[in-house]
Amino acid sequence: MITFQDVSKTYAQGGHPALSGVSLSVKAGEVFGVIGASGAGKSTLIRLINGLETPSAGQVIVDGDDVAALGVAGLRALRRRVGMIFQHFNLLSGKTVAQNVAFPLKLAGRPAAEVKARTAELLERVGLSAHAGKYPAQLSGGQKQRVGIARALATNPKVLLCDEATSALDPETTEQILDLIAGLNRELGLTIVLITHEMDVVRRVCDRVAVLDAGRVVEEGAVEEVFLHPASDTARRFVREAEGDVTAAPGVGGRVVRLTFKGEATYKPVLGEVARATGVDYSILGGRIHRLRETPYGQLTLALTGGDVAAAIAQFQAAGVRVDALSGETAQ
């Protein structure tokens, strides 16, 4: 659906490349995350998809079209197929909720009856039918983002671009908006590109993710692989921030390891079985259970002492548990 072929972008002012040699593909119907720190090039990347920016080198192909080669009419048609939602909502303050949602339909010259019916349908989908006559100033942040989503869907796009769509929201509202986005992907088959600086957002809704650092893709793959086995320093930093950077507390001895359980292994009593079999004692330094979309996984950070620690690590691994050494000898 979307392909970047060795894309670079350098702005005239400053001359520093915002993107350098970016190549990636987004499959039709998937939720693709792009994560990076501020200034990594995320917003530039997403603006290249709908032609708000043009590449300095390389090609951006969207639904079969070379975006940079499109004329005015072609870009207008592309933007009807590519909806976008923003961090700060970008609503028209002088128009009601219904008028904001109807705006792109009116610009497209749709008949009044169609505009009215489509607007009502979209407001129902995002749960705002009762707020159709309100103005943006009367809405909460989450409600404003729902209006933005409804407006982005007005022209039945194939692609939805989400530029930091939850970063201005509180945690509970973020969960609700992510649930809505995931539902749109499931129910409408939308291809979604989600820009964020939060690994927790990626884990919650994305199928695959690209990690950007200083304008370059430093890692790309399935969310499960990148989250549980990050290969780049940048990805490891984001995972630590999402999980909590647990290291040995002062005075804690032994070998400190992180155990990662995935799928059904998450709920099995592996820890007790290994401790009994090997005589190893353990102190729990941290732990949590989460989901990568629908797949449960758990992580425990332990200090292992006494007994046969090497045998304990081998037994964990034989049970399908990943073991990462955080201090002491390296686990295999």
Curated annotation (Swiss-Prot):
Q: How does the entry describe its membrane topology?
A: Peripheral membrane protein
Write down the Pfam families for this protein, in alphabetical order: ABC_tran (PF00005), NIL (PF09383)
Q: Which GO terms describe its cellular component?
A: plasma membrane
Keywords, ordered alphabetically: Amino-acid transport, ATP-binding, Cell inner membrane, Cell membrane, Membrane, Nucleotide-binding, Translocase, Transport
Subcellular localization? Cell inner membrane
| SUPFAM superfamilies given in the database record | ACT-like, P-loop containing nucleoside triphosphate hydrolases
Q: What is its EC number?
A: 7.4.2.11
Q: Which GO terms describe its molecular function?
A: ABC-type D-methionine transporter activity; ATP binding; ATP hydrolysis activity
Q: What sort of enzyme, by top EC class, is this?
A: translocase
In what residue span(s) does the ABC transporter domain sit?
Answer: 2-239
Reactions catalysed: L-methionine(out) + ATP + H2O = L-methionine(in) + ADP + phosphate + H(+); D-methionine(out) + ATP + H2O = D-methionine(in) + ADP + phosphate + H(+)
Q: Note the CDD domains from the entry.
A: ABC_MetN_methionine_transporter (cd03258)
| InterPro entries in the record | AAA+_ATPase, ABC_transporter-like_ATP-bd, ABC_transporter-like_CS, ACT-like_dom_sf, MetN_ABC, MetN_ABC_transporter-like, NIL_domain, P-loop_NTPase
Positions that bind ATP: G36, A37, S38, G39, A40, G41, K42, S43
Nucleotide-binding among keywords: yes
Q: What is its main location?
A: membrane
Function statement:
Part of the ABC transporter complex MetNIQ involved in methionine import. Responsible for energy coupling to the transport system.
The UniProt family comment states: Belongs to the ABC transporter superfamily. Methionine importer (TC 3.A.1.24) family.
Whom does it interact with, and what assembly results?
A: The complex is composed of two ATP-binding proteins (MetN), two transmembrane proteins (MetI) and a solute-binding protein (MetQ).
Q: What is this protein called?
A: Methionine import ATP-binding protein MetN
